[in-house]
Amino acid sequence: LISCGAVALMYLVAEKLFDERIGLIAMLLTAINPWQFMQSRWSLDCNLFPHVFLLAFYLLLLGLEKRRYLYLSMIFFGLTFYCYGIAAYSVTAFLFVFFIWCLWKHQLKFREGLLCAVLFIIVALPETIVLGINAIHLGKTIETPFFTMQYFPDSLRSADILLLNFSFAQLGRNAWALFSRVFLQLPDIFFNSIPAFGPLYHVSIPFVFVGIIVFTSRLFKEKKIEKQTQMLALWGFLVTGIWVGLITYEVNINRVNIIFYPLILLCAYGISLAVGKFKKLMPVIVIAYVVSSALFLVTYFTDYAEESKQYYNRDFLDAVVKADGMEEYDRLYITGNLGWQFNQSATEILTQYACKIDAQYYQSEDYAQRYHYIYPEKSGAELAEIVGDGLMVLYEEDLEYLQFPYEIIDEVGEYSLVVTQG
């Protein structure tokens, strides 16, 4: 739903920055964009980041004319911190540089900028404290009557930030990861892109470069300060994405997802420039995108959909739901084998999702007594004693490790619901 809303929002942003025609092009490009489909399918927390930033960005553009929108934008910029931790060193940098410009060019009064900073800090502060206590390894969680700022003793994410572990060699690797994934559109992980199409369609890249080069040139030549400030905001949006790619450890597409909306906007701008210069390009461009999007959609809803069942754990989710519905079994013993990986933490999280287990029930004794997570390969003959009269949810390869008589009472794809015999 949020991704669908972003399609309309892209029209509004492009229409505000450019004109209605570019707004329509940007909206259409977003609607058929491979990245838009892929990140919508993968409900990863960080994939909210570009959408919330885009909304805040649009409100920022409106706020340059009407201050109430500017103050509202600060709330949404603050909320980006709860979408993805990299907002701490990307959104903050974007706003700091942009407001320095606005104060310098008298687009904002100092008290207006100060109020914006206060609103932004108030909203972002709890998450900022969470990041801080984990960065310095404070060793304790901070609790208040309204929210808890959690300390995670096993958190390793600070190692992903170049600023905290700087080396020129790593900077070079980060730059190559950014350029290869975003601009060369080389293959990324399964969840992020289909190699034949990339995140933007390969046909888009020439228009992206045309858009970036011409837009940057016109930005520095623009004489009207109000227009230049708007243009600088979009340029800053793009630079923020590049900054994220350079500072974050060897980014993949989902880690640098903030860069794709400005790239789509500048691609639309590049297409408009190309068509304005060479009218006969219009049907060629339309055909290229129609063919590309048609091929993508066919692949996405057929081959990719079939292959993704394994990686999105469809059979596992269905098997767990079916087992949970068998109330005659008081205890469930669920394998950590997802087929493509063994991960007991992931299977527990997926079980909680599939069985709609809320936080209160998760913390209760009833949850601990009913749901158990096992490793059949290492349990051997002892598993029969552990399971007793409970119900096991096992991957097909787990069955060969059972060293006792058993009965398969049902099968769901590659998973079996199994009980002991005797």
Where are these regions (language model features)?
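Membrane-interface transmembrane helices that cradle and orient dolichyl/undecaprenyl
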Residues: 17, 53-72, 80
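Transmembrane-helix motifs of polytopic, lipid-linked glycan transferases
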Residues: 1-18, 55, 207-215, 269
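Transmembrane-lumen/periplasm boundary regions of multi-pass, lipid-linked membrane glycan transferases
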Residues: 38, 90-213
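Membrane-proximal, lumen/periplasm-facing interface regions of secretory-pathway glyco-
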Residues: 282-327, 334-353, 359, 364-376
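Hydrophobic/aromatic-rich transmembrane helices and adjacent perimembrane loops
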Residues: 39-40, 89, 205-206, 227-276
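Signature aromatic-anchored transmembrane alpha helix within multi-pass, membrane-resident enzymes
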Residues: 75, 96, 118-121, 265, ...
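Short helix- or helix-capping micro-motifs
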Residues: 26-31, 77, 81
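Short acidic/glycine- and proline-prone juxtamembrane loop motifs at membrane-interface regions
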Residues: 35-46
